[in-house]
Amino acid sequence: MGIKLPTLEDLREISKQFNLDLEDEELKSFLQLLKLQLESYERLDSLPDYTPRVKYQRTLGRPPMKEENPYGALVWITSIKGKEEGKLKGKRICIKDNVMIAGIPMLNGSKMLEGFVPHMDATVVSRILDEAGEIVAKTTCEDLCFSGGSHTSYPWPVLNPRNPEYMAGGSSSGSAVAVASGYCDMAVGGDQGGSIRIPSSWVGIYGLKPTHGLVPYTGAFSIEPTLDHLGPMANTVKDVALLLEVIAGRDELDSRQPDSLPPPPVKPYSKLIDGDVKDMKVGIVKEGFNWSNSEKDVDELVLDSAKKLEDYGIKVEDTSIPLHRMGLDIWTPIAIEGATATMILGSGVGWGRKGLFETQIADFFGNSLKSRARDLPNTVKGVLMLGYLMIKMYNNRYYAKARNLSIVLKEAYDSALRKYDALIMPTTPMKAMRYKSEPGFDEYFIMALGMINNTAPFDVTGHPAMNIPVGYSNGLPVGLMIIGRHFEEDKVLKLANVFERIKK
């Protein structure tokens, strides 16, 4: 691409910005030094980049027609097949549109990525194709995934198939609706603040945010590496477990994962869901209920559903984790300042980790930020302004303190999980919010972020957390959330399977 040499004026601006107080003679000396150092950049630029090999051929596909996309769930229809035999043979699978599929346009719900066509397959995509799954669509998601509603997405909003006057939830809105409406058997979603679990709750399906690092994030658009998760969504616990079995496991390209994690399959999750649950203990977390925005019918249905576990020999007790009430406050600086660093200043890829960096995203999104940042959604404009302000004025201390307190928050949950096999609370304090095409400024943000009280803390601590549909109230689904110990998805899925049997 060629590297533009800096000018003296460029260095004057940098000196002024960072209070270096350098005179022009000093700057001229630095200019000569930088030109020498840039020779390494030029040589680096001459080398071919590393991109994972695309293993399977595919046709381009097409945008959906209006009549086949009544709720706005789909953004691109395709048919991509890999091996002929495997665990996912016969399964139709949708992929959230923040995940790269080679040759298929990717919007990430945003005008900012219009025209972007990835050159690589995300690791989860390759693993699905390796096990004979058919990828049938990319699904609509919230604009740059920074919303728990389904009203900010480009090119269209996503409506709730249970009642189209309501939102589907987000940011993995299209994945949830594609599953709920029967378009596919399974879907991959992403979760940094609740984005798998919120739409799963609001449309009434199963959705699992795995332990941080269990499923590789390679080839997906990052918000903040310590919050980034991909996970399975489906109409049955068995299908959630089966998809997790395929996509979980060590990927040498993603440093979010622990080195000790084995390659897939990590565990035979689909075979473990029928395991013995007698003598398991679950704790109902008091602080997950009775928020200022809680709906009484949601709290009551979750409590009643949890008590039914006792019929299966599971001990159910109330427990208290006071710090849970501060979990969202701990998440906020990590999400806002972290997203500012990774998404905005870091052009969608950021710094400070090993593994694969999606340079194609950096080039395209970085250039979009320079030329049309006005097209950013208000959610991300707010993130940019507050994040940059807090970094500049307070020296990154609030991000650092929040990360420190995440250790304390994790230990608070771990302490409870030493007594209990799992914890339970409502996934969201309320049922689906009503969709509005032109909400006021404040209402827009409530629709985007007013439901993440219980979900966001577990993105910070990395615990596995799964939405369980436990019934309806006033025609809308209600979701219960199971939280487990790190890397004990098998126990979470076993409990989920009990709830599924209760429903039947």
Swiss-Prot record:
It catalyses: a monocarboxylic acid amide + H2O = a monocarboxylate + NH4(+). Active from 60 to 95 degrees Celsius. Keywords: Hydrolase. Its EC number is 3.5.1.4. Active from pH 4 to 9. It comes from the Archaea. It holds the Pfam family Amidase. The active site is at 96 (charge relay system), 171 (charge relay system), 195 (acyl-ester intermediate). The keyword Hydrolase applies. NCBIfam families: PRK07235.1. This is Amidase. It comes from Saccharolobus solfataricus (strain ATCC 35092 / DSM 1617 / JCM 11322 / P2). The lineage of its organism: Archaea, Thermoproteota, Thermoprotei, Sulfolobales, Sulfolobaceae.
